[in-house]
Swiss-Prot record:
Methylated by PrmC. Methylation increases the termination efficiency of RF1. Keywords: Cytoplasm, Methylation, Protein biosynthesis. Its main location: cytoplasm. Belongs to the prokaryotic/mitochondrial release factor family. It is found in: Cytoplasm. This is Peptide chain release factor 1.
Length: 355
């Protein structure tokens, strides 16, 4: 491990030199590439330097115990050794995690797609609950949420809602939300008080930049149509809504949230790029994972990942067996307990795979 850490520190120092080179400074692509690489390894280098400093202090403290010391001084040095050993262990564990290969998409913005699935109107209402949950979580994180496309129901739910969350680390936190979310509750329209079970699916896609996925104009068919509101009625007499079809993959995206056709096309292209990128990413990940089973699902949209039980005010994540009796707070966006546990489980899996 120490050899790998030293190599990372050497690379960090080399990047410092490169970023001071006038030739690099004048090349915006290289400057961006090297700056990102340096930023990605900065925390590892800082923790490694702290680790080396603690080890040096520990070595000196243990050497002092070899000297002739009075009882009081010896006790003080022993306490210092104990404290330094604890620090060394903590830093060593942090370094093991930092050395685990990082998902290159973790720092990206995300496009989230929530759809009502089994359960009709109740599923659509639950899709709305999930959208508000993620919006509130994003707000707490200081991220910005923007609706790209929404298909409403007459009761105020969503057949489908697609929205973007802009914020560093959004994908790292939200990628584990991929899958089928199940809700158990008594619908307001249920006079007999029977509990109904409905589901909504969530897809979390990392935003893809143009440099990462090259979509040629000739490969995209553009169709325009009049926007429609709840119930299918026309709300716009101009052809402002846009449907994009990526011919090589068959991926289709529609957007009618904006009054301007140009803005709808821009939003639709963001989603199209993300979906095509995600399709290739999923295929590559499936090939990588075929020889090992992952404990935390991040891609299978059909996987039932979580149950929200209203009568018992509890939420259970089935992947890690975690149940929390705070459903009301979770729907207000307080997702940290689940997200932190899922991140830790993923890190453990990655560490195991790297060994």
């Amino acid at each position: 491990m120490l050899d790998r850490l030293q190599a990372v520190e050497n690379r960090y120092e080399k990047l410092n030199e490169l970023l001071s080179d006038p030739a690099i400074i004048s090349d915006s692509n290289k400057l961006r590439e090297y700056s990102k690489e340096q930023s990605d390894i900065q925390e590892t280098v800082e923790v490694y330097r702290e680790y080396k400093d603690v080890r040096e202090q520990l070595k000196d403290a243990k050497a002092m115990l070899e000297d002739k010391l009075d009882a009081e001084m010896r006790e003080m040095v022993k306490e210092e050794v104990s404290e330094l050993e604890s620090q060394e262990k903590t830093l060593s564990e942090r370094l093991k995690i930092l050395l685990v290969p990082k998902d290159p998409n973790d720092d990206k913005n995300v496009i989230v797609e929530v759809r009502g699935a089994a359960g009709g109107d109740e599923a659509a209402l639950f899709a709305g609950d999930l959208y508000r949950m993620y919006s509130r979580y994003a707000e707490v994180q200081g991220w910005k949420t923007e609706i790209i496309e929404a298909s409403y129901t007459e009761l105020g739910g969503y057949k489908e809602i697609i929205f973007m969350i802009n914020g560093k680390g959004a994908f790292a936190k939200l990628k584990f939300e991929n899958g089928a979310h199940r809700v158990q509750r008594v619908p307001e329209t249920e006079s007999g008080g029977r509990i109904h079970t409905s589901t909504a699916t969530v897809a979390v896609l990392p935003e893809a930049e143009e440099v990462e996925i090259d979509i040629h104009e000739k490969d995209v068919r553009v169709d325009t149509f009049a926007s429609s509101g709840p119930g299918g009625q026309s709300v716009n007499t101009t052809m402002s809504a846009v449907r994009l079809t990526h011919l090589p993959t068959g991926v289709v995206v529609s957007c009618q949230d904006e009054k301007s056709q140009i803005k709808n096309k821009e939003k639709a292209m963001k989603v199209l790029r993300a979906r095509v990128y995600d399709k290739f990413r999923q295929e590559a990940q499936a090939e990588y994972d075929q020889n090992r089973k992952q404990a935390v699902g991040t891609g299978d949209r059909s996987e039932r990942i979580r149950t929200y039980n209203f009568p018992q005010n509890r939420v259970t994540d089935h992947r890690i067996g975690l149940t929390i009796q705070k459903l009301d707070q979770i729907l207000q966006g307080k997702l940290d307990d689940f997200i932190n546990a899922l991140v830790m489980e993923d890190q453990a899996q990655r560490m195991e795979a790297a060994e």
